[in-house]
């Protein structure tokens, strides 16, 4: 199937929570994380804010239907990936990689020095996926105050402390 990556538009925002919910279904394969499939997702206002800033990209199928997205936010001289989700029926098609490539292009053009994210350390489609694309796992000290605050918040909402990690791709 043919896919296209483009900058997200305001009218896309209402469709994005359903994509994130679909992507979350993959966590049902991992009994200890199955609860994530039923957890809340980012709201429309979150997406609209990042779309307005120009740091939100969409993967769409040949019919122009949204099937994935990457939402990012500029934090000083880094671009932080807040969410990368691909609808379950469209996973394993290289869309996550293509969305990340678009974010890297944007980061270079915006004079960012790195991309950052937090993710699950041992879930195959999380940290191992990002590591294959050049992201490095950070120690607690290397993560810095901003990423440590995100990891702390993730613990507060129910993630086990040792299950999450911060990663960085230096440009």
UniProtKB/Swiss-Prot annotation:
Keywords: Acyltransferase, Transferase. Its EC number is 2.3.1.-. Transmembrane segments: none annotated. One of its GO terms (molecular function) is acyltransferase activity, transferring groups other than amino-acyl groups. It is an enzyme of class 2 (transferase). CoA binds at residues 84-86, 128-130. Residues 3-162 form the N-acetyltransferase domain. InterPro entries: Acyl_CoA_acyltransferase, GNAT_dom. SUPFAM superfamilies: Acyl-CoA N-acyltransferases (Nat). It holds the Pfam family Acetyltransf_1. Catalyzes the transfer of an acetyl group from acetyl coenzyme A (AcCoA) to an acceptor substrate and releases both CoA and the acetylated product. It can use a variety of substrates including spermidine, spermine and N(8)-acetylspermidine, 7-aminocephalosporanic acid, colistin and thiamine. This is Acetyltransferase PA2271. It comes from Pseudomonas aeruginosa (strain ATCC 15692 / DSM 22644 / CIP 104116 / JCM 14847 / LMG 12228 / 1C / PRS 101 / PAO1).
């Amino acid at each position: 199937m043919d896919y296209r990556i483009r900058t997200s538009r305001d009218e896309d925002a209402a469709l994005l929570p359903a994509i994130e919910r679909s992507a979350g279904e993959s966590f049902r394969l991992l009994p200890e994380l199955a609860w994530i499939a039923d957890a809340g997702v980012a709201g429309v206002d979150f997406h609209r804010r990042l779309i307005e800033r120009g740091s939100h990209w969409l993967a769409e199928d040949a019919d122009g239907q949204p099937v994935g997205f990457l939402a990012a936010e500029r934090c000083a001289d880094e671009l932080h990936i807040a969410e990368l989700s691909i609808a379950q029926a469209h996973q394993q098609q290289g869309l996550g990689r293509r969305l990340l490539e678009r974010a890297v292009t944007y980061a270079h053009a915006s004079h960012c020095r790195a991309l950052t994210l937090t993710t699950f350390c041992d879930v195959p489609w999380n940290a191992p996926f990002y590591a294959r694309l050049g992201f490095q796992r950070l120690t607690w000290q290397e993560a810095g105050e901003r990423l440590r605050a995100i990891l702390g918040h993730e613990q507060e909402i129910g993630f086990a402390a040792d299950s999450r990690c911060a990663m960085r791709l230096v440009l």
